[in-house]
Amino acid sequence: MAKVVEVGRICVKTRGREAGRKCVIVDIIDENFVLVTGPKSLTGVRRRRVNIDHIEILDKKVDIQKGASDEEVLKALEEAGLADFMREPVRIARITPFTL
């Protein structure tokens, strides 16, 4: 089953300084970028634009509206019982280039 990029879908950042942290898609900017938030008070991921290739979409989803504030996202996560799930970071395997 292909995972759909949609508002409210929970994902894991796979690149950058926030790699391994979970976030929620708040808005779809275009076919390559989405707006995500942790929210920062919960996961440490601040609201920012992210390339779709730099996130791994999970099968969990929360019911939020497009462009929801961090407070609304936090409330939806707590109502769905996913606050503890969001706090746990995911270990990302780092691939180092092969050199001789």
UniProtKB/Swiss-Prot annotation:
InterPro entries: KOW, Rib_uL2_dom2, Ribosomal_eL14, Ribosomal_eL14_arc, Translation_prot_SH3-like_sf
A Pfam match: KOW
GO BP term, example: ribosomal large subunit biogenesis
Superkingdom classification of source: Archaea
A GO cellular-component term linked to this record: cytosolic large ribosomal subunit
GO molecular function: RNA binding; structural constituent of ribosome
Keywords: Ribonucleoprotein, Ribosomal protein
Family: Belongs to the eukaryotic ribosomal protein eL14 family.
NCBIfam families: PRK04333.1 (NF003320)
Listed name of the protein: Large ribosomal subunit protein eL14
Source organism of the structure: Aeropyrum pernix (strain ATCC 700893 / DSM 11879 / JCM 9820 / NBRC 100138 / K1)
Lineage: Archaea, Thermoproteota, Thermoprotei, Desulfurococcales, Desulfurococcaceae
